[in-house]
Amino acid sequence: MELEAKIQSLTATKHTLFQNLMGIEKESLRVSDDGSISQEPHPKTYGSALTNPQITTDFCEALVELVTPPFDSADKVLEDLGNTEHFVHYHLPDNQRYWPASMPCVVRGEAYIPIAQYGSSNRGKMKTAYRQGLSNRYGSVMQTIAGIHFNYSFSEDFWQAYQELMVPEETGQCFIDNHYIYL
């Protein structure tokens, strides 16, 4: 089937595009009053970085990651993110701030970037070891670059319609895995 015909066929299933889910992951560095990366551990008021699904750490103790659950509208995502941002700012220690830029603040060197610690459980040790490996391979400074990640997932109805149109003989998760990147 030609591309134009495939696109035309998909318009019949456009209602499935309103059933998708989205979320955001937002990273920010905590900095001390002097503008350098915080040497303080992840604030206890944020909950455990290992088990709190919405407030965790990314690479280092100072790189806070806010994670929204998946929602079906951008308004809900932004409302949830705003509420979480309000919470972390309210509970941030008085001697710290959030660095507003994606490029890191003043970093005195690799030794001044405390790798995230997730505790003594097997899962926690694995997460910390993974970050130590990133530090060894790429350097810790590179890992302190903060960003915003937009997550988007298509509904099962969309995938079924798309699969029937594109490759009827390929099914299930295998099809989804093979075709996500093309969209």
Language-model segments: which ranges?
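Histidine-centered active-site/metal-ligand motif
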Residues: 149
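Loop-rich catalytic cores of soluble enzymes, especially ATP-dependent carboxylate-amine ligases
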Residues: 119-137, 144, 152-183
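Terminal catalytic/cofactor-binding subdomain
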Residues: 1-135, 142-146, 181
